[in-house]
A protein has these predicted regions:
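Extracytoplasmic ligand-binding site segments that recognize negatively charged/polar headgroups
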Residues: 1-91, 96-105
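Extracellular/periplasmic catalytic domains that process cell-envelope and extracellular macromolecules
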Residues: 1-6, 41-44, 105-106, 126-128, ...
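Solvent-exposed loop/turn segments at secondary-structure junctions
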Residues: 10, 18-20, 55-58, 117-120, ...
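Short, well-ordered amphipathic alpha-helices
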Residues: 34-36, 119-122
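Short, electropositive, low-hydrophobicity segments enriched in small/polar residues
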Residues: 71, 111, 118
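Paired acidic/hydrophobic, glycine-rich loop segments that form the ligand-binding mouth/hinge
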Residues: 93-94, 110-115
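Extracytoplasmic/periplasmic substrate-recognition and gating elements
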Residues: 99, 114, 124-170
């Protein structure tokens, strides 16, 4: 058994001013095209683009963007996702699973593929006057659920239960 603790999504965080400046009024601010269209992400390379260092999640997103099963293990499907990632890689500043939290807020990058909670932290910590938005693309996004559970062989199940009860208090 488990108790739902937190919901997260994986989407795009972006610096509104820098992305608008780089792409103009026609920026696809509602779509994965912002990251996965080479001609779009190329224009953002100068202000910095980061991607999660989480191959299983990123490849699933790439597969979904291509209209394929995000859980596909087909060599043909994975080759298509690999080709998509290779097409944008020259425009990616780095792959990392936490550095973007600070970098998005302080202007080191203008677009990050990341976890919603991290991007909201970046927005909260952003320099004064810097607007960071979070985008769940119209094509859809991955949703993650964290659960609290007590293993059957936990050495202190009473303490674990007390902690879970504490966390669940409003």
């Amino acid at each position: 058994h488990g108790v739902p603790y937190m919901i997260n999504t994986i989407g795009l965080g972006y610096n509104v001013a820098k992305v608008t400046e780089a792409l103009g009024a026609d920026a696809p601010l509602d779509s994965w095209d912002l990251l996965f269209k080479p001609e779009v992400v190329e224009k953002l390379a100068s202000c910095g683009v980061s991607v999660l260092d989480s191959p299983s999640e990123v490849m699933g997103i790439a597969l979904h963007y291509l209209g394929l099963d995000p859980n596909s293990e087909s060599e043909e499907d994975l080759a298509k996702a690999e080709a998509l990632m290779a097409s944008i890689k020259p425009h990616i500043r780095y792959f990392h699973s936490s550095q973007y939290i600070d970098d998005l807020g302080n202007g080191e990058v203008c677009l990050s593929l990341g976890y919603s909670g991290d991007i909201f932290i970046a927005s909260d910590n952003a320099a004064e006057g810097v607007e960071i938005n979070y985008l769940i693309p119209k094509e859809g996004a991955a949703t993650l659920f964290d659960f609290l559970a007590i293993p059957g062989d936990a050495p202190n199940p009473e303490n674990a239960l007390a902690f879970i009860n504490y966390i669940l208090e409003p």
